[in-house]
């Protein structure tokens, strides 16, 4: 609030704002799953990779929805919420925590898939290969200018190219790994 309105608010005022936001969130109709999301999760699983979700939310109903909708690909141990980090997106902390929860992976061992500018910035700041999915009304530059490595307009487009990207990534890694 200080940044946006130039004024401080009390903890009580902040809690009231949060409660109103939560009430609005819960009164909204349930959003449909974007086409291609379950397919990309299956492809990630088939590639021997771990699916994780990084969200700026800490809303328990959202976490339960994720587990309900994507439980065959995801478990709660691999969800990063606002409560897991001190600094949220666009800072790298949420994605670095995601790497930690996935088994202490290095940034080059992960892939960020994001549809929001702050998330793209966070993935890039964490030095993780970042794919932007511009599934909304933003100009492409709102995502590409934040540093995304690739940009698609639908998850289904990314899904179609996923296996080829993984093959290329593995070949590149093998070519750049020094022989010991």
Model regions: which residues?
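Short, acidic loop-to-helix structural element flanking the phosphoryl-transfer center
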Residues: 26-53
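A metal-dependent, Asp-based hydrolase signature
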Residues: 1-25, 35, 43
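Asp-based, Mg2+/Mn2+-dependent phosphohydrolase catalytic module
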Residues: 12, 38, 42, 58-180
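Short, mixed-charge, low-aromatic patches
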Residues: 1, 17-23, 50-58, 117-118
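Generic secondary-structure transition motif, activating predominantly at the C-termini of alpha-helices
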Residues: 5, 22-25, 29, 45, ...
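Short glycine/serine/threonine/alanine-rich loop segments
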Residues: 7, 49, 128
């Amino acid at each position: 609030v200080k940044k946006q309105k130039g004024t401080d608010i009390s903890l009580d005022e902040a809690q009231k704002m949060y409660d109103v936001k939560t009430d609005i969130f819960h009164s909204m109709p349930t959003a449909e799953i974007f086409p291609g999301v379950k397919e990309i999760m299956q492809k990630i699983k088939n590639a021997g990779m771990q699916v994780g979700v990084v969200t700026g939310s800490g809303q328990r109903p959202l976490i339960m929805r994720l587990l309900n909708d994507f439980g065959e690909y995801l478990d709660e141990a691999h969800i990063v919420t606002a409560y897991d980090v001190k600094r949220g997106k666009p800072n790298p902390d949420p994605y670095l925590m995601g790497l930690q929860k996935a088994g202490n992976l290095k940034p080059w061992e992960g892939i960020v898939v994001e549809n929001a500018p702050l998330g793209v910035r966070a993935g890039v700041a964490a030095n993780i290969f970042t794919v932007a999915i511009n599934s909304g009304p933003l100009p492409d530059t709102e995502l590409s200018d934040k540093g995304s490595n690739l940009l698609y307009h639908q998850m289904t487009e990314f899904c179609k190219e996923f296996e080829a990207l993984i093959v290329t990534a593995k070949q590149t890694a093998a070519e750049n790994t020094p022989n010991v």
